[in-house]
Every structure is written in C-alpha cells, then in structure tokens.
Amino acid sequence: YNNTKILDRINWRVMAGEKWVLAGGNGSGKTSLLNMIFGDNPRAYKCRIRLFGRQKGSGESIWDIKNRVGFVSPEMHQYLPAGQSVNDVLCSGFYTSEGLYNKPTSYQRILSKKWLQLILLGHLSDLPFNVLASSHQRMVLVLRALIKNPPLLIFDEPFQGLDPENIAVMKNLLNSIAEHTNCTMIFVSHFDDEVPASFNRLLTLNKGKVVSSE
C-alpha cells in the first residue's frame, strides 16, 4: 500500500485439521494476512493463495468462501443490526450474514439455544443482542462462528475484553471442538495464556514477514 509492503513473501501452508496460532505484535501483518485469506481484498486475487485446494479467484465467489469459514473479530459486533435477539444473531451464522434476514428453522433455533447453554448463557437467548455486556457479545459471536460447523475457523482476538472466568469457559469449548473434530482452526491473540492448549502450531510475523513457523 502506497509503496509500503504490508506482507512480504509469506509462505504458509495450513493442512486440514491443523490448529494454528498466528502471533506477532501490533502492525506485524496478522490482520492483513487474515483479510487476504477470508476477505474480499482485490490484492488477494493477484497472489498465490489457495483455499480448500483451489486458487483464490479461479471462479468462486466471496460467498462461496465465507460459507466454508467461521470468523470472529473484535469489530464484528459493530456491523450487526440493532434490535435483533441473541438467538437471531446466532442463527445468522447459518447464513453467513451480518444480521438475520432468513427465517431459521425450528431446529436452528433449538440448536442456537443449546450452544448458549454450553457457555452458561442460555438465559440470554431472547434478549436484544445490543443490550448484552460487551464480554457476552464476544462470547456469542464465537458461537456464531462455530454454529454452522465450517471446515475452517478463524478467531481474531476472540477473547478481547473477557474476564478470566469467561476466558476459561471459552477455552474449554474450543479445546473440546479441536480435540473432537477435524476442523482447521487459526487463533490470533496478543496473550499466550488465552491460547487453547490444543493449538500446537505457531506462525509468528514481524513487519509483514514470517520470523518463525513451527
């Protein structure tokens, strides 16, 4: 961008079922890399990026990609329409939409409530999402990423603003999913103690370059 390299010669191969931590300080390129993978950045189509065994930009739409990826970021709650219930927000995850514009099935409604019960928030199901504490909003958005059981999950600082008790609840959930599914998972955090134990691969960036991969 403007003659500045944001990402420089990144070579990263993520195999199905692997659990990766993406590390690096502010400005290291983590978010830019995730945007190249998941977002609709036009520069991504000029790079050698393969998703699910296929060159990005070889005919698939951005929705084809998003339907196979569960994603959560610290900013996501800002893009959701006000007034929709917690259950609505969770059900929107089935449709990869920012807000619920389809009519969910009874099964989807029930499944959404069961996910909330897993993290002890079942009593919040019918409340407007925007009245929740920010920590509870972030927990719900993690569930939204999980709910459609996608082959790839990307968590960009998912525990930002959570207290230690809620972090422990969410770590236990992600560990359970990592251990019992073949879902590929990428986790970004500035804090090592937030990383679920089952994430055993590490890519570290600094100034847009890979400094270690293990």
Regions found by a protein language model. Give the residues of each.
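Conserved structural motif at the start of ABC-family nucleotide-binding domains
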Residues: 6-9
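The feature captures the beta-strand-to-loop junction immediately N-terminal to the Walker
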Residues: 23-25
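Helix-to-loop junction immediately C-terminal to a conserved catalytic motif
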Residues: 38-39
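ABC ATPase NBD Q-loop/coupling interface
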Residues: 48-64
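ABC-family P-loop ATPase nucleotide-binding domains
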Residues: 74-131, 137
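Hydrophobic anchor residue at the start of the ABC signature
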Residues: 142
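A short, proline-enriched helix->beta-strand linker immediately N-terminal to the Walker B motif
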Residues: 147-151
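Catalytic Walker B motif of ABC-type/P-loop ATPase nucleotide-binding domains
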Residues: 153-157
